[in-house]
């Protein structure tokens, strides 16, 4: 459906002062207009103070039948006729043509120019002859690269634009015939070419192809590298049979067809590629891929002539996005290939396709009367009929936004859909329109007011018009010459037209119709399209468009906030893109006097709810906070506890909050969540009795569940900083176990991150970044006990071990009483391992003044004994603990043992704490390591006994225990072999007798 509005997209107009009656008109990029009449071409300025003044004029070698300008390369190409022969020529360096007497150089395409003549080309126009084996019918210049594609009866010829470098300061433009595309079963009437995409149009058919290229050193290419299949060739056999019928009063019409992708090969159109470029060509087109085939059938039910149903205005429109996004948060990758759109039209309907990842029909335009020509721009579709100039909106900017921006259609960004109905902004009366072209902010219109033709006698509608009659009538020449004019029409500036569209939408605002939303969406897309290529805008113009863009987002947010439809959620992203604060949005709401009975729509409620969930760093006033509470009390009572927990609502009157909370008992809200919210409000009021009663009304597990439902009751963020609530501060003093369990529940349910929890406890306990409070250590221990899946176990080990070591080395006591003792942790968590008995022998040998030191040491020892710990990774953390202390000695001994460095550990124990050696050996020297009893321990003890000293009696006792163990484990011969040779026989005799009796008993 096409909506019709009466806006003013067209501004002032001027007459272009042409000397001769225009036959062909084309636009010369951003600063020139070309008008051809016979063998003359005039160029007019179209920008600045010299608007519509002639810049230059030059003669062509023949009568111009078609012409086009390429901004890439700055050349004009024309199909000319002379002596009934068709020529193709390109006019280069035309800006140097100052007068009719200026010299002109004529050269052949692809030929190298002698160096002696090169310097003369710098200041004179050149004409490049492009000889063709067949007469050219049409052509198209690539708007991106400047390559030229020429259409003939059965083929398309591609001329690649190149520059012949003469020296460092000078190069001349040239072309190279690089590719021939052979096409059967379709005769091109119009073609369009853009960066490898080829569109071919006949009277009733459109074919869209993509030429795919590879580097020259890639795949080898034959003379005909690809030929598409032609499954309908069998249909050619019947062509001769139908020719007899067609010569009479019968017309054979094929049925309409639309084929996309691989199905296009069913069209019966054969395509072959023939490479004609040089071997050193940088890119060669090796393959062709079919994208779209569309065939139309004439409507013979109305008995109209076939000329009235021909296709026209084929166009491939690239839309470049220069890296500037009006949304300011462009995180999407840029594509080198511009976004491409394909347009073609029948007399009464136009079709616009999007060609990106796939081909998709975007919009269908139904014209109120027969069209003659149309031109597509990034913002509008301009259509001319014999009596009017029509302006339609397009969805190109919407398609680009949805395709390129990964964050589109989320809570961050939104854009009107591509499928939205198009509209006609204006149908401007213009008599005798014949041709139209467009560039920048101008439209060129050619009008010819023909004299009224003598009315002919109408044929009976019952008689089918034959092809013969049609051809005779179409060839009848005009009797009289027509009056003509060439107009330059200025289009209205985007911001001015945007403001008019917004004003227009206000007429629908009160009745809340879809027309208001539709027109505001059109205004938004208009500004978005103008901002697409920001590099072409002046800074002031860009700033004005940006302001209009944000304003349009605000209008769309207002519109969606008043809706109850499924699209009401779009109020959120549009308000975000508008840059409006929550308070500014609330100020735009139309509050009624009877606020208790006011109905609030889903869009507004959705926006406020999501905004309060985010960290807006915005405090609402007492009045606005009360309004928000009232809105949710009326519209979404289940969300009221969450809303009241937002930091943006901190200024709300506590009595007002309690008033609404007490009404939630019958609304299906979680009772524990309501209880916690009431407790937080009571604490804010200073009503401690009410606070305690609320906290006692549920078990601790239910309270933890309530905090999981709404984390902001404990933890809030303000300007990027973690802020504990008053409730969290009170729980730290009164119920630290509940606080730790609640934060652990938040982390387990992904409501808070690891870094945030650490910051929370540090801020809560008033510690700086380097200091670690005991409550945070309690939380880390709880994490280890809970075995959370999202916690890296190794990092948690490092945190705890480093804190235990720091407190032991500095002899620091915890700032609060730990929630769990070492025994509690060992019994509750497998990550805290059982400490070996020999470690207790070490510990009891030292008199620690404070039990807390013992508890920290036991926790550290238990972690080192953990089966989950990689001991080698924690050795650097133990460096602050000296082996001169029992804490250092025991931890280092444990590490050496876990690393199976038993001999080193035995040396250390014999030196520092011999009392623990036998207990250590009994526990650790087993199985494969039992040999160390006589290989390491026995020799060491013997040596120390010989040396004497203060501990000689202790060493002697240890030696006896060692001999007893060895005598039990070895047979007599082995036992004799391990005894020292210089030992006293009387000392070792009892053990030898025991060993021999053991053998006789066995």
UniProtKB/Swiss-Prot annotation:
Keywords: Albinism, Cytoplasm
One Pfam family here: HPS3_N
GO terms for biological process, alphabetical: intracellular transport; melanosome assembly; pigmentation; platelet dense granule organization
Tissues/organs with expression: Found in heart, brain, spleen, liver, lung, kidney and testis.
DNA-binding in keyword set: no
Major location (coarse): cytoplasm
Stretch list, region Disordered: 218-239
Keyword Cytoplasm: yes
GO cellular component terms given for this protein: BLOC-2 complex; cytoplasm; cytosol; early endosome
Record's subcellular location: Cytoplasm; Cytoplasm, Cytosol
InterPro entries, per database record: HPS3 (IPR017216), HPS3_C (IPR029438), HPS3_N (IPR029437)
Reported function: Involved in early stages of melanosome biogenesis and maturation.
Subunit note: Component of the biogenesis of lysosome-related organelles complex-2 (or BLOC2) composed of HPS3, HPS5 and HPS6. Interacts with HPS5 and HPS6.
Annotated disorder: Defects in Hps3 are the cause of the cocoa (coa) mutant, which is characterized by hypopigmentation and platelet dysfunction.
Record's protein name: BLOC-2 complex member HPS3
Gene: Hps3
């Amino acid at each position: 459906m096409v909506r019709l509005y009466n806006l003013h997209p067209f501004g002032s107009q001027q007459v272009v002062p042409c000397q001769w009656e225009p036959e062909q008109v084309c636009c010369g990029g951003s600063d020139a207009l070309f008008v051809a009449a016979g063998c003359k071409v005039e160029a007019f300025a179209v920008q600045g103070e010299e608007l519509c003044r002639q810049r230059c004029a030059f003669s062509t070698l023949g009568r111009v039948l078609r012409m086009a300008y390429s901004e890439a390369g700055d050349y004009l190409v024309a199909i000319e006729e002379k002596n009934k022969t068709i020529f193709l020529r390109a006019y280069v360096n035309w800006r140097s043509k100052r007068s009719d007497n200026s010299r002109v150089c004529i050269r052949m395409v692809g030929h190298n120019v002698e160096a002696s003549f090169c310097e003369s080309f710098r200041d004179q126009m050149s004409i490049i002859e492009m000889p063709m084996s067949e007469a050219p019918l049409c052509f198209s210049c690539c708007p991106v690269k400047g390559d030229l594609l020429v259409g003939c009866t059965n083929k398309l010829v591609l001329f690649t634009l190149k520059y012949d470098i003469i020296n460092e300061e000078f190069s001349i433009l040239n072309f190279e015939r690089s590719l021939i595309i052979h096409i059967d079963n379709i005769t091109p009437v119009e073609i369009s070419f853009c960066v490898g995409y080829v569109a071919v149009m006949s009277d009733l058919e459109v074919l869209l192809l993509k030429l795919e290229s590879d580097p020259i050193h890639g795949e080898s290419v034959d003379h005909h590298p690809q030929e598409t299949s032609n499954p309908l060739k069998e249909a050619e056999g019947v062509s001769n049979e139908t020719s007899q019928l067609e010569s009479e009063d019968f017309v054979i019409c094929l049925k309409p067809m639309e084929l996309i992708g691989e199905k296009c090969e069913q069209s019966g159109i054969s395509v072959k590629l023939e490479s004609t470029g040089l071997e050193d060509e940088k890119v060669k087109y090796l393959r062709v891929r079919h994208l779209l085939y569309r065939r139309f059938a004439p409507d013979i039910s109305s008995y109209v002539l076939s000329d009235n149903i021909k296709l026209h205005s084929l166009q491939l429109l690239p839309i470049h996005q220069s890296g500037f996004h009006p949304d300011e948060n462009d995180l999407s990758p840029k594509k080198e290939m511009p976004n491409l759109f394909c347009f073609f039209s029948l007399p009464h309907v136009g079709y616009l396709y999007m060609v990106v990842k796939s081909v998709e029909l975007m919009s269908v335009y139904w014209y109120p009367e027969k069209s003659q020509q149309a031109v597509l721009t990034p913002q509008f579709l301009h259509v001319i009929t014999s009596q009017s100039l029509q302006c339609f909106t397009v969805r190109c900017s919407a398609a680009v936004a949805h395709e390129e921006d990964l964050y589109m259609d989320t809570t961050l960004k939104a854009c009107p859909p591509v499928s939205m109905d198009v509209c006609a902004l204006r149908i401007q009366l213009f008599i005798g329109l014949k041709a139209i072209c467009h560039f920048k902010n101008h439209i060129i219109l050619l009008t010819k007011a023909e004299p009224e033709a003598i009315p002919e006698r109408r044929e009976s509608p019952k008689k089918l018009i034959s092809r013969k009659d049609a051809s005779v009538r179409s060839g009848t020449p005009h009797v009289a010459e027509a009056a003509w004019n060439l107009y330059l029409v200025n289009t209205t500036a985007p911001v001015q037209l945007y403001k008019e569209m917004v004003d227009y939408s206000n007429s629908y605002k009160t009745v809340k119709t879809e027309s208001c939303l539709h027109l505001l969406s059109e205004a938004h897309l208009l500004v978005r399209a103008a901002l697409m290529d920001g590099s072409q805008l002046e800074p002031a113009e860009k700033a004005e468009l940006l302001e209009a863009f944000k304003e349009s987002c605000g209008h769309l947010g207002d519109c969606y906030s008043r809706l109850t439809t499924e699209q009401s959620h779009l109020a959120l992203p549009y308000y975000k893109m508008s840059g409006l604060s929550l308070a500014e949005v609330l100020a735009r709401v139309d509050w009624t006097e009877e606020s208790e009975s006011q109905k609030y729509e889903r869009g507004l409620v959705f926006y406020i709810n999501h905004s309060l969930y985010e960290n807006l760093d915005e405090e609402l006033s007492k009045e606005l906070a009360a309004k928000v509470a009232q809105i949710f009390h009326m519209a979404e009572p289940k969300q009221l506890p969450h809303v009241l927990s937002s930091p943006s609502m901190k200024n709300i009157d506590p009595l007002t909050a309690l008033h609404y909370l007490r009404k939630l008992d019958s609304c299906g809200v979680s009772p524990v969540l309501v209880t916690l919210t009431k407790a937080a409000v009571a604490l804010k009021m200073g009503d401690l009795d009410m606070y305690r009663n609320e906290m006692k009304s549920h078990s601790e597990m239910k309270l933890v569940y309530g905090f999981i439902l709404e984390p902001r009751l404990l933890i809030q963020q303000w300007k990027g900083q973690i802020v504990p609530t008053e409730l969290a501060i009170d729980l730290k003093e009164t119920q630290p176990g509940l606080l730790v369990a609640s934060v652990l529940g938040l982390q387990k349910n992904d409501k808070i991150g690891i870094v945030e929890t650490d910051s929370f406890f540090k801020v809560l306990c008033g510690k700086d970044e380097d200091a670690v409070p005991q409550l945070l250590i309690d939380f880390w221990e709880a994490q280890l006990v809970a075995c959370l899946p999202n916690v890296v176990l190794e990092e948690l080990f490092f945190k705890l071990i480093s804190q235990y070591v720091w407190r032991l080395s500095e002899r620091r006591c915890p700032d609060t009483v730990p929630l769990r003792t070492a025994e509690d942790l060992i019994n509750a968590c497998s990550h805290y391992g059982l400490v070996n008995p020999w470690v207790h022998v070490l510990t009891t040998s030292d008199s620690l003044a404070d039990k807390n030191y013992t508890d920290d040491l036991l926790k550290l020892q238990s972690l080192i004994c953990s089966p989950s710990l990689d001991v080698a990774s924690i050795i650097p953390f133990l460096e602050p603990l000296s082996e001169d202390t029992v804490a250092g000695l025991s931890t280092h001994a444990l590490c050496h043992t876990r690393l199976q460095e038993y001999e080193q550990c035995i040396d250390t124990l014999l030196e520092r704490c011999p009392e623990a050696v036998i207990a250590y050996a009994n526990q650790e020297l087993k199985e494969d390591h039992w040999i160390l009893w006589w290989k390491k321990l026995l020799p060491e003890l013997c040596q120390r006994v010989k040396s004497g000293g203060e501990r000689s009696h202790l060493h002697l006792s240890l030696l006896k225990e060692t001999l007893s163990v060895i005598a039990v484990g070895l047979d007599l011969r082995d036992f004799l072999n391990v005894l020292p040779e210089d030992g006293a026989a009387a000392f070792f005799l009892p053990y030898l007798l025991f060993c021999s009796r053991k053998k006789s008993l066995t």
